[in-house]
């Protein structure tokens, strides 16, 4: 979850809003260098082992995509446009209010992913984490998930990783 690396640990108070702009800029610049270095290493490894059945792809994961759409400094709008990665992964909890939010997030990440790597599919945005706390959901989880999955399939999302088959949150 790249935004937590960029911002610091998650908690109820939004400390990111209090971080000075020059510090945010420096964090983004360093994050960009790190991700580009990782991709370069993966590219070199792929080049050195050409005849393997194993395919290795590098993804950058964003987890605060919806605020990135609104212009808040985030991985999606301040790092992703400046790196080359094979895939973009979205830990998509912030886009689960509706299939429309999921679509907005996927479109935003697709637009920001300008320097594509070696992933062979047209759609390079994957869902790296998705799920609900069933015990506290005040809606039909199965119905919501179906509408979101349908939207992801419609948009040719290559991978969707459901985080919790059994609810791992305390009651």
Regions found by a protein language model. Name each.
Residues 1-2, 160:
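Generic structural signal marking isolated hydrophobic packing positions
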Residues 2-27, 49-54:
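Substrate-binding cleft and catalytic face of glycoside hydrolase catalytic domains
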Residues 3-5, 52-66, 76-79, 88, ...:
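Buried hydrophobic core signal strongest for RNase H-like alpha/beta domains in large
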Residues 20-45, 70-78, 99-113, 140-151:
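Well-ordered, non-membrane alpha-helical segments in soluble/globular domains
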Residues 25-73, 90, 120-133, 159-165:
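Aromatic-lined carbohydrate-recognition surfaces of secreted/lumenal glycan-active proteins
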Residues 70-138:
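Glycoside hydrolase catalytic-domain groove-lining segments
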Residues 92-97, 121-171:
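Substrate-binding cleft of secreted/luminal carbohydrate-active enzymes
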């Amino acid at each position: 979850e790249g935004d937590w690396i960029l911002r610091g640990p998650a908690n109820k108070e939004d400390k990111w809003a209090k971080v000075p702009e020059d510090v945010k800029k420096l964090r983004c610049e360093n994050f960009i260098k790190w991700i580009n270095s990782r991709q370069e290493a993966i590219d070199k490894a792929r080049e050195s082992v050409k005849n393997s059945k194993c395919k290795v792809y590098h993804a950058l994961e964003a987890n605060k995509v919806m605020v990135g759409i609104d212009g808040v400094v985030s991985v999606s709008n301040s790092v992703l446009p400046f790196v080359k990665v094979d895939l973009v992964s979205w830990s998509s909890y912030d886009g689960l209010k509706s299939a429309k939010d999921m679509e907005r997030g996927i479109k935003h990440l697709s637009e920001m992913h300008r320097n594509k790597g070696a992933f062979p599919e047209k759609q390079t945005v994957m869902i790296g984490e998705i799920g609900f706390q069933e015990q506290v959901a005040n809606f039909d989880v199965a119905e919501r998930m179906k509408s979101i999955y349908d939207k992801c399939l419609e948009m040719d999302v290559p991978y969707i990783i459901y985080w919790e088959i059994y609810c791992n949150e305390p009651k």
